[in-house]
Curated annotation (Swiss-Prot):
Catalytic activity: UDP-N-acetyl-alpha-D-muramoyl-L-alanine + D-glutamate + ATP = UDP-N-acetyl-alpha-D-muramoyl-L-alanyl-D-glutamate + ADP + phosphate + H(+)
Matches recorded under Pfam families: Mur_ligase_C (PF02875), Mur_ligase_M (PF08245)
One cellular component (GO) term of this entry: cytoplasm
Protein name, per record: UDP-N-acetylmuramoylalanine--D-glutamate ligase
Lineage: superkingdom: Bacteria
Species per Swiss-Prot/TrEMBL record: Rickettsia bellii (strain RML369-C)
TM helices/strands, residue ranges: none
Binding residue positions for ATP: G111, T112, N113, G114, K115, S116, T117
Documented EC number(s): 6.3.2.9
Zinc in keyword set: no
PANTHER family per the UniProt record, alphabetical: UDP-N-ACETYLMURAMOYLALANINE--D-GLUTAMATE LIGASE
Length: 450
């Protein structure tokens, strides 16, 4: 879906993606643009000009050659209906990026959980071994703003982005896991699975699909692709040793795909837990395809420092480990970090998600004491009552201070203070990043005082 200079293009959505699309196309074609939110339109006007902002009620939207849609726009939106009624092709920033990146290795990662960590880990392993593969996509850097690379890119792709792709084809595609998510967008689980599986569309016989077969939904996709014989498939598992695939069991990585070898993983506090074993297995497979030796890959994995706010290990003070998992905004995500640790002083709170912390109850035995704050504190207290020790706090700062005070009295050899909120942050913070930054500042202040 090539963009030509004389074409009339509509850009809908002024988030990071929409802005990157406009910047990419403004000198190449005639553009009109719009966003439903006034605050976004004002931002666009400050950056560029209000002359390009045309409401979708204007007839100009009916006479376009293409519409570039931002991934956050639901496919039930009026702009999509206009495109269908007037036979206007809808495209995306991912497809535009694909057009300009021919000849480069495009590595794509998707999954309900672990996408960002895996994307960053792959890039780290390759960079650590002299290969330039910048990250881009859903990880925070729009693909059209990715820094130049002579080798390739590691792209994190969400189901929203995959929903829109029509020409993009990865050289290596990773599917980490699928659990119910974004069902408001995809209508049902089948729609969500279909979107995720699009990461394997249009791949050729020399391309690789790397899939977690421990996950039932992913295993079904693996089986379907296996029957088509159109790409090379590498299964991975963290529950069993595969006869042909990549496995991680008890911190031993077994490579029975490229050659029959096993290695002990070097301990890395930024990559603890079964969920991170999935991320490591997938990243290892990618690096092997690229041509790296196993020993080099294992060494690079050990030096990965993790991503901010995703089970981020901050350090140890007074035999207490501090972990920032502010990104864990629901119980399913928080379970992963709780499962990875013991003797936990757990900080949780904010605006509760559906189900609260019910999913965590089977793992309450790992929690020494909980510190609940924010709007959810009473709800969480009711769930925890008579099962674990807890205290209700005014805010995250008080929760941190009380947790540290209690952990200092604990004579256990290793204690862990974990921020895994199980909530959205909007009652006290702008976003999960701001929440995590406060936790980091509290840790740093404590460290300076010692």
């Amino acid at each position: 879906m090539t963009i030509h200079k004389k074409q009339n293009i509509g850009v809908f959505g002024f988030g990071k993606t929409g802005i990157s699309v406009y910047e990419e196309l403004q000198s190449k074609c005639n553009i009109i643009a719009y966003d439903d939110l006034e605050v976004n339109r004002n931002k666009f006007e400050e950056l560029f000009s209000k002359n390009y902002i045309i409401p979708i009620s204007d007839i100009k939207w009916q006479n376009l050659d293409k519409i570039v849609l931002s991934p956050g726009i639901p496919l039930t939106h009026e702009i999509v209906k206009i495109a269908k009624n007037f036979n206007i092709p809808i495209t995306s920033d991912i497809d535009l990026f694909f057009e300009k990146s021919k000849g480069l290795n495009l590595l794509a990662v998707t999954g309900t959980n672990g996408k960002s960590t895996t994307t960053a880990l792959i890039s780290h392993i390759l960079s650590d071994n002299g290969l330039d593969y910048p990250v881009a996509g859903n990880i925070g850097v729009p693909v059209l703003q990715a820094k130049a690379s002579k080798g390739g890119y590691v792209l994190e792709l969400s189901s929203f982005q995959l929903d829109l792709v029509k020409t993009f084809a990865a050289k290596i595609a990773v599917l980490l896991n699928i659990t119910p998510d974004h069902l408001d967008r995809h209508e049902n689980m089948e729609g969500y699975i279909t979107a995720k599986s699009k990461i394997f569309d249009r791949m050729d016989k020399d391309s690789y699909g790397i899939i977690n077969i421990d996950n039932d939904y992913c295993h079904e996709i693996f089986t379907n692709l296996q029957q088509k014989h159109h790409i090379k498939l590498i299964p991975f598992s963290v529950t069993k040793i595969l006869e042909k695939g990549i496995s991680i069991v008890n911190d031993i990585i077994t490579d029975n795909f490229f050659e029959h070898i096993s290695f002990k993983l070097i301990s890395n506090k930024s990559l603890q837990g079964i969920h991170n074993s999935e991320n490591i297995a997938a990243s290892y497979a990618v690096a092997r395809i690229i041509g790296l030796e196993p020993v080099k890959i294992i060494e690079s994995i050990s030096s990965f420092q993790g991503l901010p706010h995703r089970m981020q290990y901050l350090g140890n003070i007074d035999d207490i480990n501090f972990y920032n998992d502010s990104k864990a905004s629901n119980a399913i995500a928080a379970v992963q970090s709780i499962k990875a640790l013991d003797n936990i002083y757990w900080l949780a709170g904010g605006i509760a998600k559906e189900g609260g912390i019910e999913e965590i109850k089977p793992y309450f035995s790992k929690i020494k004491k909980a510190y609940f704050y924010g709007q959810a504190k009473e709800m969480f207290a009711n769930t925890a009552k008579d099962i674990i020790d807890f205290v209700i706090c005014d805010d995250l700062k008080q929760a941190f201070e009380l947790a540290y005070k209690d952990a200092c009295k604990d004579n256990e050899k290793e204690k862990n203070i974990l921020l895994a909120p199980c909530c959205s942050s909007y009652d006290q913070f702008k976003n999960f990043e701001e929440r995590g930054e406060l936790f980091i500042r509290l840790y740093n202040t404590l460290n300076l005082c010692l």
